[in-house]
Amino acid sequence: MNALGRHILAEIYGCDAAILNNRNLIEKIMVESALEAGAEVREVAFHKFSPQGVSGVVVISESHLAIHTWPELGYAAVDVFTCGEKVNPWDACNYLTERFKAKHMTATEVKRGVFEEPVKVANL
């Protein structure tokens, strides 16, 4: 069965707290990770929380990358969802793990849009 997309749910631990609490740097690294994976970036939106933490999304032509950070725990929750064959979501996850100076990353890949029977696409 072919899937429409691949969705990586990554748990990134032991990260540099200063990086995880820097909105501008998180945005830069997230955009770089999308490009590293071969994606085409469309939009970005990031928010810095008080007293700490950053959440954000990078919208790509192929879907999205999202992040939520807990600097006080050295932890980042990351989603990388890509459609098509051009972009490798694992490249983005590995890039993020390296740039966050993480000690450990675990991840699960979920196939999205898996149809057991042929689907007729409607003309819209």
From Swiss-Prot:
The gene coding this protein = speH
Q: How is it modified after translation?
A: Is synthesized initially as an inactive proenzyme. Formation of the active enzyme involves a self-maturation process in which the active site pyruvoyl group is generated from an internal serine residue via an autocatalytic post-translational modification. Two non-identical subunits are generated from the proenzyme in this reaction, and the pyruvate is formed at the N-terminus of the alpha chain, which is derived from the carboxyl end of the proenzyme.
State the signal peptide span. Answer: none
Any keyword Heme? no
Name of this chain's protein: S-adenosylmethionine decarboxylase proenzyme
The cofactors required by this protein are: pyruvate
Single GO MF annotation: adenosylmethionine decarboxylase activity
Q: Which InterPro entries match?
A: AdoMetDC_C, AdoMetDC_fam_prok, AdoMetDC_N, S-AdoMet_deCO2ase_core, S-AdoMet_deCOase_pro-enz
User: What residues form the catalytic site here?
Assistant: 63 (schiff-base intermediate with substrate), 68 (proton acceptor), 83 (proton donor)
A Pfam family matched by this chain, by name?
Answer: AdoMet_dc
Cited PANTHER family: S-ADENOSYLMETHIONINE DECARBOXYLASE PROENZYME
Q: Could you say which EC number(s) this protein's record lists?
A: 4.1.1.50
Organism domain of life: Bacteria
Q: Which UniProt keywords apply?
A: Autocatalytic cleavage, Decarboxylase, Lyase, Polyamine biosynthesis, Pyruvate, S-adenosyl-L-methionine, Schiff base, Spermidine biosynthesis, Zymogen
Catalysed reaction equations from the record: S-adenosyl-L-methionine + H(+) = S-adenosyl 3-(methylsulfanyl)propylamine + CO2
The free-text cofactor remark is: Binds 1 pyruvoyl group covalently per subunit.
Per its database record, what is this protein's job?
Catalyzes the decarboxylation of S-adenosylmethionine to S-adenosylmethioninamine (dcAdoMet), the propylamine donor required for the synthesis of the polyamines spermine and spermidine from the diamine putrescine.
Entry similarity comment: Belongs to the prokaryotic AdoMetDC family. Type 1 subfamily.
Pathway field? Amine and polyamine biosynthesis; S-adenosylmethioninamine biosynthesis; S-adenosylmethioninamine from S-adenosyl-L-methionine: step 1/1
To which species is this protein native?
Answer: Acetivibrio thermocellus (strain ATCC 27405 / DSM 1237 / JCM 9322 / NBRC 103400 / NCIMB 10682 / NRRL B-4536 / VPI 7372) (Clostridium thermocellum)
